[in-house]
Amino acid sequence: MALTPELSRQTKLKEVAGIPLQAPTVDNWRQIQTFEAKPDDLLICTYPKSGTTWIQEIVDMIEQNGDVEKCRRTIIQHRHPFIEWARPPQPSGVDKANEMPAPRILRTHLPTQLLPPSFWTNNCKFLYVARNAKDCMVSYYHFYRMSQVLPEPGTWDEYFETFINGKVSWGSWFDHVKGWWEIRDKYQILFLFYEDMKRNPKHEIQKVMQFMGKNLDEDVVDKIVLETSFEKMKENPMTNRSTAPKSILDQSISPFMRKGTVGDWKNHFTVAQNERFDEIYKQKMGRTSLNFSMEL
């Protein structure tokens, strides 16, 4: 059956505590909030389009001791359940997580205040990756364009306003990143920067390895650096979402793995938008000790 625009795009976002989320996620909120984390869970946390798939593949390669074939056992979105995912009649992210044996590696885009409380009470490990706001905004725009489960983003200029006002799915980039940054010393949180991962992947991968309590030989780490490069992952059907149905991701509009660079925002921001964004950034982020690289 051909998908009509009404069926192909679930355009409505709903809110939980002022945070816009996809409607099926909000409809399934009770199951998400009562999710039972386990003490040995590792939760990968990101704002959308901040290197989620990249860090997932790095973590999986470390967990599998650099065994490429084991990392190809299934597509990446099946390896690490996305806890807030809900799209009936498919099993929810919570359903999939509950079926997994321990130790589990899970993922989320939720801000700190919406995370199921059991993650905090069980003192789980959290791996957070932050990406500079300008590149994140651009990447999320192209994802919005191709995603069939998010609202139409409109023109770049229209989307620019939506993003800076925190009206995109999962809410404000500013609040999300600040929220995780401010609690990084209170819990077992490894806070990484996308730009550092691009600048020196081996160094950042070694940090992840130590955080996971693994000790791999240098040649294995070098192999992980190679296998998790953007070029390799873009061609890997286990990571490039090429198996996702067009009714969810339409990659004829924009590829899921598009550029993976630092500084692509310069190809989208007008001078006026850049000046305005910098002013908003100062207002929202001026009191934090967070520092991002806008280019390499």
From Swiss-Prot:
Which keywords annotate this record?
Cytoplasm, Lysosome, Mitochondrion, Phosphoprotein, Transferase
State the Gene Ontology terms under molecular function. aryl sulfotransferase activity; cholesterol sulfotransferase activity; sulfotransferase activity
Catalytic class of the enzyme: transferase
A GO cellular component entry from the record = lysosome
Q: Where in the cell is it found?
A: Cytoplasm; Lysosome; Mitochondrion
Assigned EC number? 2.8.2.1
Record-annotated active site: 109
Query: For substrate, which residues are the binding ones?
Result: 107-109
Q: Name one GO biological process term.
A: sulfation
Q: What does this protein do?
A: Sulfotransferase that utilizes 3'-phospho-5'-adenylyl sulfate (PAPS) to catalyze the sulfate conjugation of phenolic compounds. Does not transfer sulfate to steroids, dopamine, acetaminophen, or alpha-naphthol. Except in mitochondria, where it can add sulfate to cholesterol producing cholesterol sulfate, which alters mitochondrial membrane organization, and impacts protein complex mobility increasing state-III respiration, thereby modulating mitochondrial respiration.
Identify its protein family: Belongs to the sulfotransferase 1 family.
UniProt-recorded name of the protein = Sulfotransferase 1C2
